[in-house]
């Protein structure tokens, strides 16, 4: 029987006894069993888990039919439909005697469920009518029943509209990703404004109100204490309010206190809650002083937690949503300005930095590849004796999810082995008994964070998670109900131990923590991303310790490098690690030591790359999932996500996978994408590396004076062997012999540096060096004073700056009068040549320009300029090499091996340049030599055409530009034939398209 026939039979059944079904005798539980279960089975949903999926991946969660005590305000949705473990929509059932097409309360209820859970839609049905509601809008008491209602189907329409309904809420729609596409407009509304934004705004309003009141009670409160007090009170009130909606406390208890401003009853309630729940949640200071005030803000805060002032349904306010809110909450703090005004401002480490929360589906994927994998084949005893941690836990998103997954794993274990540990919720659904959940939390879950308020938020989230699904009956009579988690959620610096020679005066700011005393079976998380320069600004004393302590603290390392290394140190043998990270460590030079550490120890088991897909909301970060095992792996898996939305549905065809031998990795850049590897192999098979052609020493960085302000100047005039310039408002002149032409980038960023335009010096650099034979020598103090008196005089003027202890000169000076040496002496001989290529290191293409003026340039890490010299004995023309470097092939190569920076720039340092593949020419073969000479001549002509374009009037300029473009097309064709990549050529974007998509 096909699905439409099954549905028609169900409709006929309803019609045949419609008066009975509409009567008060027929209840909601009967409706669910007789009709709604059947309707959604027809729509493809596995209502009873007949497929035997593990608990954490059940398609449908079904609530108990009629809870004895649950009122409309404290019950959960009757059905939760999921994509694996992600909630997609709720179904709320009403008996047919409730006309959901006209009655407002059920509509408001299902919308509040969906809004609180950040769902796109939810469904309301009594079978006679089935309604689909948009859940992106705030719910107001004055809303009509039709407000936000997208669809309303009468039962007689179900067969005719079956295909449409199946497309909207059918199982196949959800599991193919069509559901998300169908409701994408609603998703966009949620991204712009959702429960997170609303609740965070409310919490911040409460913070200001409470802070002002506490300062009235005790005006000398320090900021840290004030923040702790405010957070403790908000946690306490929100906790009790959540417990009311979860049927753990009498509904509206707090509301009645607020209405009556009954401070004695509220104080009594808070103190009794301290005894009942313990765990430090209700250890509140200044209770009597705050609550005895009839005008206290606490009363309005409480009222705002109830409908209609509150849109939320706390029975479905999930821990991950609350965690996201707290993650942003933790990035700011209450501050008192110099005028005594209370404000909320970013913490120092978050100033000018976006706060991002890890998407729940990413958290779940990491848990699935670590916690679930670790627990496979283990008994309950083995699992309960294991330790799972996040050592930069923040508000606890990862360990809260780990806690849930461990519960689900043990439910499946006990269904097979010991049902006495379980409580049956409905015919096919079980939960762990409360004492087992409590045991998991106390024995298995650990979190560490350097932010004290983060540990409090994490504890709060875990305790709410512990109480999820509980009622007064299931938690029992024993008190205190909640465990103290002060030995599980720990306040300290995960990266620094007490033995790391921390000075006594820095103990409180650094907060060393002996994490090596702990050993974990699984570590998960999203560790802090912080560049070396930011660490130097915010935590310079910690930075010094990192450099001494960690192998991965190399060059311009990122803080997350250290977290990977630290996690491996404290991971047990055969333990699992799962992190979401920027993928820069795979390729940047600073990641060299980390790559060596991982490859030599063969820890890598799996790497999932998201490519250019942006995982974090409103944040441009190229990310990957890194999975390590503390055991030797001969092979590892690499996955490329081609379609992120399809990846979420686990459709393998949208995930390219490769298996590599671990021995193929070393400290060098990891290039793992199969198609990229295929292209690179083909390119290198026809080419030779630039460094091998010209010699690696001829690919060099520019000069580094370490004091450009005093060495580099704009020329006013040049006469009689002297060059005139202005410094600090005074005109000077020095011997021109000890200067060199210099090119510097204009501050406006318009540096006029372009492949097709020869370098034109725009300033000069003081050059206290001379050439003796083939060597460059520093001009000693006495010789300088004697032969170059004007430069000597000027250097005396700036001596105080050049001789500054903070200025680094390498190699170290051996005498007292070397203070005017450059900071580094590399590249001097490379700059001072008749003709060379100058390369813009950080660029978005077309930054390989020819210099004919012996121009000097500066370099600095991933910015500035570098130099390529073509020795006389090399047969390749400088113009041939310029043409190849400018091509789309080498720009693409730079994007693979170079660093990608914000603003769509790629840094191609000398390490990348030396490896660039230059198509090989057999100069003894006349045809090949002709190709070389044609490309060389055409590049010269392109440079000339561009120069004419710049100098011409508008009429001629149009013609020159047209010629230039035609010649450029011909050049592209010539170089395409040189590389001869066949069908793979289309995989390499043009230079312009490459940077559009970065």
Swiss-Prot record:
UniProt keyword annotations, A-Z: DNA-binding, Endonuclease, Hydrolase, Methyltransferase, Multifunctional enzyme, Nuclease, Restriction system, S-adenosyl-L-methionine, Transferase
Annotated InterPro entries: DNA_methylase_N6_adenine_CS, MethylTrfase_TaqI-like_dom, N4_N6_ade-DNA_methylase, SAM-dependent_MTases_sf
Catalysed transformations (reactions): Endonucleolytic cleavage of DNA to give specific double-stranded fragments with terminal 5'-phosphates; a 2'-deoxyadenosine in DNA + S-adenosyl-L-methionine = an N(6)-methyl-2'-deoxyadenosine in DNA + S-adenosyl-L-homocysteine + H(+)
Name the record gives this protein: Type II restriction enzyme and methyltransferase RM.Eco57I
GO molecular function annotations of the record: DNA binding; site-specific DNA-methyltransferase (adenine-specific) activity; type II site-specific deoxyribonuclease activity
Gene3D superfamilies xref list: Vaccinia Virus protein VP39 (3.40.50.150)
Regulation: Mg(2+) is absolutely required for DNA restriction.
Family listed: In the C-terminal section; belongs to the N(4)/N(6)-methyltransferase family.
